Amino acid sequence: MSEIWELLDMNRQKTGILHERGVKVPDGLYHLVVEIWVQKPNGDLLLTQRHPDKPLGLKWECSRGSAVAGEDGVLAAHRELLEEAGIFAPLDDIQFKGYTMHSHYFTETYLYESPTNDITFNLQAEEVVDAKWVAPNEIEQNLDELIPELWDRYGKFIKVG
């Protein structure tokens, strides 16, 4: 079954218009994409590696995906993290950090600061083939391995200093 999105207007407000994934989004409307960074107390960030059959296959990213109809950004980020990495982040602990407007979608960036360094993951095989904890300075040395613009949004919305 195909994903159904609820489209947004240019102010990120829900329009009530339902839209099937894979069909071109009409001009002036947008769908919502969320990304959620997971950070351990020691500062390491979770990266997951995209399945090779997906666009940008084998590139690294934080958990991300499209919000489905009925979800807001926090709920979509919670679901994506749980589905892709098997990590449960309480809704109240998911922090909205900012958004970026694109031609037909918005990307909302979220952060979950884990209270513990002892986090295990359970990967969704259809979406993700590997995961690792990486220090931010290591990521900066290997930006060509990440999906485009991901680290720019991290720097804009999350990185301090």
Predicted regions and their residues:
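Acidic, metal-coordinating catalytic segment for phosphate/diphosphate chemistry
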Residues: 1-35, 41
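Short, solvent-exposed loop/turn elements at beta->coil junctions and helix N-caps
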Residues: 21-25, 95-101
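Short beta-strand micro-motifs in enzyme catalytic cores
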Residues: 32, 106-110, 132
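A glycine-rich, hydrophobic loop/mini-helix early in the fold
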Residues: 33-57, 61-64
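The catalytic Nudix box helix
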Residues: 46-47, 62-95
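NUDIX/MutT-family hydrolases
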Residues: 122-152
